[in-house]
Swiss-Prot record:
<keyword id="KW-0689">Ribosomal protein</keyword>
<dbReference type="GO" id="GO:0003735">
    <property type="term" value="F:structural constituent of ribosome"/>
</dbReference>
<dbReference type="GO" id="GO:1990904">
    <property type="term" value="C:ribonucleoprotein complex"/>
</dbReference>
<dbReference type="Pfam" id="PF00276">
    <property type="entry name" value="Ribosomal_L23"/>
</dbReference>
<keyword id="KW-0687">Ribonucleoprotein</keyword>
<dbReference type="GO" id="GO:0005840">
    <property type="term" value="C:ribosome"/>
</dbReference>
<dbReference type="GO" id="GO:0019843">
    <property type="term" value="F:rRNA binding"/>
</dbReference>
<protein>
    <recommendedName>
        <fullName>Large ribosomal subunit protein uL23</fullName>
    </recommendedName>
</protein>
<keyword id="KW-0699">rRNA-binding</keyword>
<dbReference type="InterPro" id="IPR012677">
    <property type="entry name" value="Nucleotide-bd_a/b_plait_sf"/>
</dbReference>
<keyword id="KW-0694">RNA-binding</keyword>
<dbReference type="InterPro" id="IPR013025">
    <property type="entry name" value="Ribosomal_uL23-like"/>
</dbReference>
<comment type="subunit">
    <text>Part of the 50S ribosomal subunit. Contacts protein L29, and trigger factor when it is bound to the ribosome.</text>
</comment>
<dbReference type="InterPro" id="IPR012678">
    <property type="entry name" value="Ribosomal_uL23/eL15/eS24_sf"/>
</dbReference>
<comment type="similarity">
    <text>Belongs to the universal ribosomal protein uL23 family.</text>
</comment>
<comment type="function">
    <text>One of the early assembly proteins it binds 23S rRNA. One of the proteins that surrounds the polypeptide exit tunnel on the outside of the ribosome. Forms the main docking site for trigger factor binding to the ribosome.</text>
</comment>
<dbReference type="GO" id="GO:0006412">
    <property type="term" value="P:translation"/>
</dbReference>
Length: 101
């Protein structure tokens, strides 16, 4: 397992979608993460950045879409999403109301 010095290199951004808003009520938060990060690294990064306890991490690799333009075909970049479930009794993450120092 390669070590990454800064946990903010692992967590790229929160996913803003209707599904992610719905999952927040169940204490599940969705983030775009680095494609080479594993579940253990994601868990440690979330706990360090937001100061919460993580119960589980599920990841999804999404292949880039094939897009066509006038000159030919191209591909959007592939992404990786992490669905992070917090432990019972843990504080919620306030990711959409301001930045975290």
């Amino acid at each position: 397992m390669a070590t990454i010095a800064n946990p903010r290199d692992i967590i790229i951004a929160p996913v803003v979608s209707e599904k992610s808003y719905g999952l927040m009520e169940q204490n599940v938060y969705t983030f775009f993460v680095s494609t080479d990060a594993n579940k253990t690294q994601i868990k440690i990064a979330i706990e360090e950045i937001f100061g919460v306890k993580v119960a589980s991490v599920n990841t999804v690799n999404r292949a880039g879409k094939r897009k066509r333009s006038r000159t030919g075909f191209g591909t959007r970049k592939a992404t990786k999403r992490a669905y992070v479930t917090l432990r019972e009794g843990s504080d919620s993450i306030d990711i959409f109301n301001g930045s975290v120092a």
